[in-house]
């Protein structure tokens, strides 16, 4: 919970700066590049997080990396602030929440769509169009094959779930039978 609060606070601050400077996408890409680098080089992540290293050393290490990544001054200052405040371990969550803010700003919703079989791109586009009509937002579909659904489709956008799977229908039928047998 604390991680989410921190991620929201810091990502909103960076997003507000990005919005003022019309750099929303740029800052998001820079955050992603840095997070990916930390994932590839865990020793770098450890060095930036480790309070045993003096703050000046951690900042110098970051400055060299920032130079190589050609980070903008705002993103450099932002990550330096995370180093000073000992919040580098939250950077991945901050980047994820930052992308949620981009989606909200751009009126985009991400839909997780699951089906028992692989779906044609055309079918996925039709599902996206239907969801766009329902939500009034541009839908980005993230498809996943899930044989446990038996058949049909399950679509989820945030907390909103449309479950048209055979699995759900069978579970509903089972509940109906239980109620009928008991009632």
From Swiss-Prot:
Protein name (record): ATP synthase subunit delta
PANTHER family: ATP SYNTHASE DELTA CHAIN (PTHR11910)
Cell location: Cell inner membrane
Highest taxon in the source lineage: Bacteria
Family annotation (InterPro entries): ATP_synth_OSCP/delta_N_sf, ATPase_OSCP/dsu
First-listed, main subcellular location of the protein, grouped into a coarse class: membrane
Keywords: ATP synthesis, Cell inner membrane, Cell membrane, CF(1), Hydrogen ion transport, Ion transport, Membrane, Transport
Record membrane topology: Peripheral membrane protein
Secretion signal span: none
Gene Ontology terms for molecular function: proton-transporting ATP synthase activity, rotational mechanism
The family this protein is said to belong to: Belongs to the ATPase delta chain family.
Gene3D superfamilies in the cross-refs: N-terminal domain of the delta subunit of the F1F0-ATP synthase
Cell inner membrane keyword on record: yes
Pfam families: OSCP
Membrane-spanning segments: none
